[in-house]
Structures are given as C-alpha cells and as structure tokens.
Amino acid sequence: MKDVITPPQHLYPYRWFLEDTVFTKDKGKVFSCFACGGGSTMGYKIAGYDVIGCNEIDPRMMKCYETNHHPQYSYLEDIRDLVKRNNLPEELYHLDILDGSPPCSTFSMSGLREDAWGKEKKFKEGQKTQVLDTLFFDFIALAKRLKPKVVIAENVKGLLLGNAIDYVRRIYKDFEEAGYYCQHFLLDASKMGVPQKRERVFFICIRHDLGVHFLKVSDLFNVEPYIDMEFNESEIYYGEYADYKGKPIGVKMRKLFEQRVAGDIALAEAYKKPVSYTHLTLPTMLAV
C-alpha cells in the first residue's frame, strides 16, 4: 500500500491567491533594478512594501512588469544610463530598499563563465549590447548615488565558486566605498516555502550611518552580528503539489524527463528511475 503524503503547514504558504492578498504598503519604499517581470517585486509587495519603480532593459519584460505592477516610475533603459540621469525624482533619494538581480548567466555553472567574462553580449531580443559580468558594479554605482537605507542584490550560486570569487571581493569593496556594510547568504528556496530546490546568493547591505549603531566590523568581510536567515520551512515534496497519493506524473511530463540532456537536473540518481518522486523536493528544471 502506498504512503499518503500529508502536506505540512507552512509558515509562508505557496498556495495563495492574488485576490486574497492585502498589500499594506506600510513597510517602506522599494525600487527594483533588472526587474524583469516583477518576481522580486511581488515578494516585496506581499511583505508589505511599496515598490514605487523599476528599471529594465527588455521592452517585453517592461510591458509585463507595468501590466502587473503599475509602477510610479519606470525606466526602460540600460542601468548605466539610469546612473547618469540628472533628472531622477527626489523620492528615489529616500528609498528604504534598492533591490536588484544583476544578470547571472555569466556566473551560472551551466553557462560559459570565464569564457564570457569581459565580453559584450548581443541579445536576439534587440536590447542594448552589454558586458554582463560588470553590471553588478553599475548597480552598486546606482546605490552610491541614491543612498537607500538597505541594498539587496541576488545572484546565482556560481558567483561563489571558482575564479568568480574575485567578483565577490570586488562587490564587497565597492559596497564599502559606496557607504555600506555588506553580508552575503546562500539561500535554498526549498527551505523557504518554495516547492523546488533553487540556491541563490543574496547580498544584504546596510548604510554605514545606520549600521554603525549595532554592527561590529572587524574587517571588510566580517560584519557581525549576522542577519538571521534561517527560515526552517519544511520542504514541499513532489507528492504534495502533484498527487498526494503518490501517483506518477502524466505522460507529457514523463516524456520531457526522458528526453532530458546532461545538466538538466542536479540529481544524477534520477537518470534511471521513474519520476514519481513523492518524497523528494524536485530540482529547478523539473519543478513545474
């Protein structure tokens, strides 16, 4: 007899509906860079923040963002051009959080990594040619200009691995010169109420004049106390959102799985097994 999976009670339930959500907008003001369709913006809104604007270079993504979030300020342009603007509204100089997810493909373990560093990338979608691996520093330059209370930046785990660690050292150095104490954390979405394993690194930076009152700084890379980032959420297993009785997934998804190529998934053991992982949290590529 197959086990029946009883879904755990999650502190941050993933089964929520937009019409049931109250956006209080009372926690502070946020501006989002590299905003794409607004994934991080939705998170801030659910948490009670007022996301007043965004920056995005892709016209299609900006259209999606504006349709979903109706920003007060939107800048469809290269972040390097945004940094140079001399007509930014005064409200952007009084932000609580500057948020950004600089392009990560050049640091991803599934990307070109070192072979792509320092090289301009041309996009088939038509947006401006850019050197992707330096955009993080342009984001910090914007932080230096706007002086928000807190800066939060997200990127892939690969930024912490191999030769990419030199970028992390410069990120810390540039944040210090911009006037911020910096800490970084490698977080796993499966420990935070998300039904997939997705590891991302987050840089959380506090402005010097605020952090000096409660932070102990021994050197550039050692700022204490560390922010408590332990969410301790129960993992959401495949069987919880696919089939509580542990039945295999449908033919379409199983065929997709069988036609996968090397690198599609992190679990090597899955190559010769069926897809009915009722007691496992699926890796990113299969969590659909």
Regions found by a protein language model. Give the residues of each.
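Core alpha/beta nucleotide-donor-binding catalytic domains of modification enzymes
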Residues: 7-147, 157-161, 166
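Extended charged
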Residues: 1-4
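Class I S-adenosyl-L-methionine
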Residues: 85-95, 109-282
